[in-house]
Each structure stands twice: as structure tokens, then as C-alpha cells.
Amino acid sequence: MRVDFHSVVGKIKPMHATNNGPAVTVYTYEDGSFEPYDSYKIDNAPPNRVQDTNLNEFKQAGIPYARNHDASFYYRYGGDHTVDVAYIFRDFDADPTDPDNYDFACTDHYIKGCVLADTEVFYRLGHRIEHEIKKYGTLPPKDFHKWAVICEHIIRHYTEGWANGFRFKMEYWEIWNEPDLHWNDGKVSPTWGGTFEQFCEFYDIAATHLKTCFPHLKIGGPACSGSMVWTEKFLSQLKAPLDFYSWHCYAPTTKAVMDKAQKVRGFLDQYGYPEAESILNEWNYVQAWRGDDYIYSQEQQAKIKGAAFVAATMSAAQRGSIDMLMYYDARPGTHWNGMFSSLPMGKVLKAYYPFPMFNTLYQLGNCVETITEEEGGYICAARNGDEAAVLLTHFNNDDSTEAKNFSIDLVGFGDENGAEVEFYLLDETHDCTFAGKSTYYGDRFSIELPMPNFTSYLLKIKKKQLN
């Protein structure tokens, strides 16, 4: 493995974004300001009161964006009164220009929690997945243009202050979720109850209207569940502007993720959208969707194997064509959440730690060239002035993979005064724990680390200064 700090190859991309934000109760003052509601300040509160928020842990991870899809499944976010268009604007026959016809209360509260975590909301316009026997919010709207006008006013509420709203920084607005799910297998779709042709018409109308209203915002979608046949067919006939194409991939290897990313990028370039961002905004470790392999996958997501998959995928995606990763899911209470326990709320799980580890690189900003020929070895590095960092992971989906020693050559950062390297270890028994430090001299030096499968290291590097 090799890191060349002389060679800056771009910016570190937001690979540590999530679906959904922190669980936090927000107190809003009469002047509109708001802060976390601290249950510990309540007079006569029981001394053993369970922590009921993960705001601090969420903020410490430095999560840059939170997509709000499926937020309405969780009562702490507001449940059936939150985020989804049909929950905010409940009477589709009402006047979409009248603020009284909108119920923003719970969604306001949820978004404030994200703002308190310094996390920008990536807003999914549409509805949560409906696995129920009867579908409601995933049916095609009665009037496509009116639906777009409703969304226009939701955007104005959160970015322009309409209807006693806000001027939050919310750049990404996504139209719908997984319209391709069961699109050609004869099953009833839990995400789009119409035809492919209807969705194409719907998307064209909605995206064109919203981009006309908000040329400065990023309008895109449609959060494709992963069908490349559907993706090509959709992009080949798309008429509307497309600032980003969002898609999903659940897989057991980084290769599967990167192969799909390459196909998406190829279709975008081929069909006239070379500037559109490719955003993978649902992903997690999944070996299969049925049987014992599915159960195994769910078990691993919050364990060290799931954590290593997260770290490896972040590093691989940084080197590839993906512009943003959004892990599914940080929503408490779902079995997809490998980051946070539900009780106590602030307890973090193994898959949490790659997020603050990657954030160390993200804060440095400048991605530098890395080379790896080590099977199962993943590496990503960044620098800014006299500071640098390296994220290193050993991930192989085969649980029987033997431990290795990884040798890393680091070029272009140190000098005769020395570079101090701090080591932080994530494995079965360490949670991004400080594991020692060493000083290395010269413009080029090597580090060798023992790397059992599913191990990650964060190396924080600083130039030593003469007194």
C-alpha cells in the first residue's frame, strides 16, 4: 500500500452521510430560536433516568447530510405526521397556496434536531415504503402538477420562510423513492402503484416545475432500488433536468457496490447527464434477502463485520464515481441501524465508529493519492497543511480469512523534524481506541500493521515543529 501526500486528487466526498437524523426533543422559544430539551434539568427527575437522545453522539460523528426517507416510521420523529407529502398536506383537494392546509409541526421538530447536530437535511419528497396489504401514499397522485406545487410550498417553507417557516440550508430535494421496486415482476409494488410510463410523466412534470422555481437548488431522484434495466430505460427517455441521480445497493462486497456505481455513471454520461451527481443513498451489508443468509446479514450489520464493510465501502467509494454515500439507516428502532442502540439511546454500536473516523478525513478536505494491491485492503487518505490522516481497513466477506500484515509506504509528508503518527484501532475489542503513537523521520517512511479480517485503523499524522 502507498500514500502519496504530494498528489492531491480532489476533495474528500461526503461518504459518511446517513438516512435520518438524531432522536432529540427540541425546545423552541418565542423568538424562534431552539435548543435540545434536557430532561436532566427537570426538577425532581429520577437520578437513574435513561438517556433519551443520541444528539451528542450524532454530532460527534460529523454526519454531513441526513436523508429523511422512512422517518415517519419512528414516533420520536413525529410518526405519521412527519416528512411525507401526504402527511404534511393531508387533503389533496385543498388549495396548495393556503398555509392553513399544511401541517408542518412534527417535520419542523425533526428537522430542527438535524440542524442541532450540524447535519443538513436531504429531503425525500414522496412517501415511506408501504409493505401493508393496502397502499395509500405510494399511489400516483391524482394531479401530477398539483403535487409538484405542493412540494414547491414545502420547499419554500424550509428554505424561504413561507408559512412561518425557516431559511435552512437544504440543497438536495429528491423526488420519490424506489419506483422500480417490482416494476416488471407482477408483484404489487410497495413504492409506486402506477406504471413505468406514468412515473416518467410524473417525474418530468415534478422535476421541471421544481427546477424552474428553484434553479439554485439540486432537484433529482428517484432513489432507484437498484434495477439497471430500469435505470437505463428511465434515463434514456428523461426530459427533465437532473441535478443528481439517486440509487440503492445492498451487497456483501465493495466490488458489488462499485460495479453498480460504474454502470450508473456510464448511463448518466451516455444519456446526456455528465454533470449529474451519482448518489448512493441507501446501502448496507446484505448477503441475501431470504433465509439464513438474510438473518446472518441483519446480525452482522451492528457487529465488527458490518463496521468493516462500512469503512471499506467509504474508502472504495471515495476512489470511485460515487459523489455521496448515505447509510441506511440511522433511525432508532430499525434492525437496519448498526450505529445506535435504542436503549439507552446514546449507546453506539460497532458500525457507528467508521463515521467519525471518516469524518477526520472529511474535515481535512484534500484527498491524496492512494494505491493498494493488497487483497481485502482498503485505504483512503487526506491532508491539510501540517495535518494528515489515513483510514485503513481489512475486509473480506469470507469469515475464515486469515490475518495479514499490511505495509504502508507514506510519501511526501514527513521531513527531518519528524512526523508524529497516532494510531486508533477499531476491531472486535476496540472502539476506535487510541493504540499508541510513533514518530517517523524523512520524506518517506513505512508503517507495518497487523490486520486481522474486519480490522480498521485511523492514523492521525502531524508534522513535528522545532521549538
Range-by-range predicted roles:
Residues 1-57, 61, 465-467:
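Mature N-terminal, pre-catalytic/accessory segment of carbohydrate-active enzymes
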Residues 284-386, 395-398:
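Aromatic/acidic polysaccharide-binding cleft in carbohydrate-active enzymes
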Residues 195-310, 320-322:
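Noncatalytic carbohydrate-binding groove/subsite architecture in carbohydrate-active enzymes
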Residues 5, 43-58, 153, 157, ...:
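Short, acidic/polar
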Residues 18, 114, 154, 173, ...:
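Conserved, mostly hydrophobic/aromatic
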Residues 405-453:
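Acidic, Ser/Thr/Pro-rich beta/coil linker or hinge segments at domain junctions
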Residues 61-252:
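Substrate-binding cleft and catalytic face of glycoside hydrolase catalytic domains
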Residues 374-417, 453-460, 466:
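Carbohydrate-binding surface patches
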